[in-house]
Amino acid sequence: PVPSLARRPPPGIQADALATDEERAAATGVPELLGGMEYGHISLAEQRRYKTDIVRTQINRLGGLPLESPLLTNLIVEELPLRDNNEGLSWRTRVRYNVTKVRTQPGDQKSGGKKSPAVTWRVGMHPYRASQPVPVVDFPLAALELRNLELEKLNLRGVREVEATVSSRGRVLLQFIVDPRFSIEEVAKDIEQQAADAWGLLAKRKISLFFTPQSTSNGKPKRRRPGSSHTPYRRVPEGDQLLGAGLRSVTEEVTFGSRRFSYQVSAGGFWQIHRAAPSTMVGTMLTMLRPQEGECTLDLYAGAGLFTAALADAVGATGTVVSIEGSPVTHKDARSNFAPDGCSRTENSANTRIEVIRGDVARHLVDLKTALEFGEIPAIDAVVLDPSREGANRTTLERLDALDPKRILYVACDPASLGRDTGILRELGWDMVQLRAFDMYPNTHHVESVALFERAPAKPRPRRRRTK
């Protein structure tokens, strides 16, 4: 239970579980409860205390570290800086909306002197484990640049999903996933007109629209599984995409001290969603892992290269970085970013050996083992491991252990996965030597953890007693 002193009003009546359907309908026109802000009624300080206890418990129960370990007793979930709001709002630079049908009473709104349609299609989101999306009036966690667009006012007939992005430079990219039963050209024309009416000259507002047909299975759109967070469509080949007004990628910039890194990230590509997360994670990686000039490093589950760029800058012209990523969209970004003239190379990494590999991490670790044995790459010094919420698995960790790196930095968005994999690494002879956690998802139950592992000292063998 949440102590009364730690309670606070939720961020909007759509997120208030204590409000009645009638109260929500009267305030927003939408009676349903919106998910995604399950900690919104708890003070931020209490949220971080809860998350600290969760990380400690998972590392203890699943990873085997004793609760009295200084790594756990000294752990505090750290707050990330927020530019626009200090209540844990307006931090999401990436938001995926589902589109849901909303029935209205004819004539309850006026548009150009005509009665509004009885049915409109609005942006929505899935409540926790719900099969149907709920219309969104305002999503308080979204960045202000996205909230100010008021996407809920668009009639998105023919659209299945909307992916909204705002870059560190303030450019907005809206990707519309179009139902294959509709003409993508007609849908694009209609939405572009609505956007121009609502926002004026899109180029001046730095807004780009991008339309993609949804893939189908047996002629029907693929459906989203209840409770699933995975995208129910695959990306179609570039030739089958329709580009709307503007670009289909954004430029992200990350600074840490005097270092500045640039990245090109496509629509649908992966990037950290908290505005302050990229700089925080790069700084944390550099201070914990301490990559040195001339070292050989691995960046596993590398995405567009957030850590790859910083690693390459640190190891310099005499060092090596191997990046492995499975997503075709994100891998394509990484290949472009780290081409000889790629935007993610710095003056210090202009001549760094950077290998960008697409595919399954566990499988390619076998290839790296072979490359090591034949002297094709130098001995591996440091590894960044940043898997998805499911974490790495025993096979991946055993193959990584076989490469015999000196240190491993594990970045985890699920403390249970980190706890499980900590237990596996300890079995393989690794010690956790540093642990930090960050409130990268305020007003939700999610938390980011970063752990540094080093090879445990070899234990002396017990001396056998001599027998006569």
Give residue ranges: language-model regions.
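Internal alpha/beta scaffold segment
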Residues: 130-215
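Extended interfacial segments that mediate partner engagement and assembly in macromolecular machines
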Residues: 1-163, 167-169
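Flexible glycine-/small-residue-rich
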Residues: 99, 127, 176-178, 265, ...
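Rossmann-like S-adenosyl-L-methionine
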Residues: 182-468
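Short, well-ordered strand-loop elements centered on a beta-strand within folded domains, enriched
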Residues: 1, 104-128, 170-176, 208, ...
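Short strand-loop junctions, especially beta-strand C-caps/beta-turns
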Residues: 40-42, 139, 177-179, 266-270
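Nucleotide donor/acceptor-binding cores
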Residues: 93, 172, 294-295
